[in-house]
Design a protein with these regions (language model features):
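Hinge/beta->alpha junction and helix N-cap segments in small-molecule ligand-binding domains
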Residues: 1-6, 22-68, 83-91, 113-116, ...
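A generic "cationic amphipathic patch" detector
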Residues: 17, 24, 32, 51, ...
Length: 190
């Protein structure tokens, strides 16, 4: 919830209103939480994103997602920001935008999950906390506790992580002109 809420809030605070959102469908818990975070941030800014700019589909459903990306990129007025919470679609998004003659980040600001680590090529990245190392250390400690317990297994323990995500600009980048007046953001661009 939190990571998607923060990313959406950042996009809206930058003044973008013509945006697209991609994520797993709400039949999966992460998809449900992310959609709620997206909607809550939009509600906070009084923004309604048209349904044709929202795509909710599992990763396995490649044809509709490809069609959505190519449709969005080729519109007369394409979105100025795309919030992506579908894992592993960074290169496909770049290919769809490039084939339509759009530049990142000058024409379209991409944000959200960056599994392929492509955004640093454009002068910014997404800081996602807690890191994979934090998750791995917690899982390893729980596993060691179970192994060391022998036959007397410890009580199952549930750890809840609150994720956070924000853009980090490594250099001065030119983002698309906003649709509305920007508001104050937490991020200080270099």
């Amino acid at each position: 919830y939190t990571a998607c809420y923060e990313v959406t809030k950042d996009v809206l605070a930058r003044g973008y209103r013509n945006i697209a959102y991609m994520a797993d469908p709400p039949i999966y818990r992460p998809g449900c939480d992310r959609l709620r975070g997206f909607r809550d941030a939009c509600k906070e800014f009084g923004v309604t994103v048209p349904q044709e700019n929202i795509f909710l589909a599992p990763i396995e459903d490649t044809k509709p997602l490809n069609a959505f990306l190519h449709d969005v990129a080729r519109r007369d007025v394409p979105p100025k920001a795309i919030i992506n919470f579908v894992r592993g679609w960074d290169y496909t998004m770049l290919q769809a935008l490039h084939s339509a003659g759009l530049r990142v980040p000058e024409d379209v600001y991409l944000t959200g999950l960056d599994d392929d680590n492509t955004l640093p090529n454009f002068g910014y990245s997404m800081q996602y906390l807690p890191s994979t190392i934090d998750f791995s250390e917690t899982a390893a400690k729980l596993l060691i506790e179970r192994v060391e317990a022998g036959n007397a297994l410890p009580e199952p323990e549930r750890r809840i992580f609150t994720t956070h995500m924000k853009p980090v600009f490594e250099r001065k980048v030119t983002l698309p002109k906003p649709d509305a007046a920007p508001t104050e953001t937490d991020e200080k661009e270099k």
